[in-house]
Amino acid sequence: MSKKHLKPLETCFEDEEDDVIYLPPGLVTGATSKKNEEFCGGSGKVQPSEMKRRSEGTSTDMTSKRAKKVSAEDEKKVGEWTKNPYFQRLWSEEDEIVMLQGIIKFEDVTGKSPFEDRHGFIEFVKNSISFEASVQQYIGKISQLKRKYTRKRKNGFSEGHEQKCFKLAMSIWGTKETSKKTDLCSSPKGKKVKEEDGDVTNSDWFENSFLLPSIESLGVDSVKRKWNVVPMEFKKKIEERLELLEADESECKKMEEMLKVKNSECVKQKTNLLNEVIDVMT
């Protein structure tokens, strides 16, 4: 009799015709005891004519035990997966509201733009966020919220949470960028020029970055023309990576300033130590 191999748990649930059945522990034990009693003839002695059946029964018993063991382990794993799903939402809905409200309040309280003073903004809102996020995570989340709620400006959102986020996003990015789009996407005759969402809202970030000066030897006008025909998806990827790079550079500058201060303190301590030694010896 050929040995049948057990399939993974999820495969067995999907394949209704599979021969392997995951039996409850009690049923497996009962079935095994009955098998043993039957081919022992009820007396505990093995009959010669039953040797073949004993071999088959042993194989069945082994398979049942393996099925029981795999079932118990798989049930444990399923329970763990249920309690700890593989994909967990990092930013809660409350975090998104706090983030958008924080952008508005930060500018009102400090008079600074949270997009220019990123570290100040993070310090401003971090105690209200449900977890400890990195600078890159803050920047990525703000970019994601901006893309999500400015792209669907025309249709808006019907659900409660998303509708609230949409209104907050419009108060941050809507008015300013809508006026830009009206000016830049209209022809002299008043006819609107078709342009993909988001292309105009950040039309100058490429020119203000280090990218354009680095390749201006190819001709500024030529570079701008070629950049205008680059696919929007690629532009957005470059913009996101540039934001992360700028955040890292800002962190490096802070660390450099801290090192300068520390170095200055070390020089001062050396001077004081030298003066003390000189005073003792003179």
From Swiss-Prot:
Keyword Transcription regulation attached: yes
One GO biological process term: regulation of DNA-templated transcription
Residue segments, region Disordered: 33-73
Pfam families in UniProt: GeBP-like_C, GeBP-like_DBD
Keywords recorded for this protein, A-Z: Transcription, Transcription regulation
Ion transport among keywords: no
Entry's family note: Belongs to the GeBP family.
Name of the protein in question: Probable transcription factor At1g66420
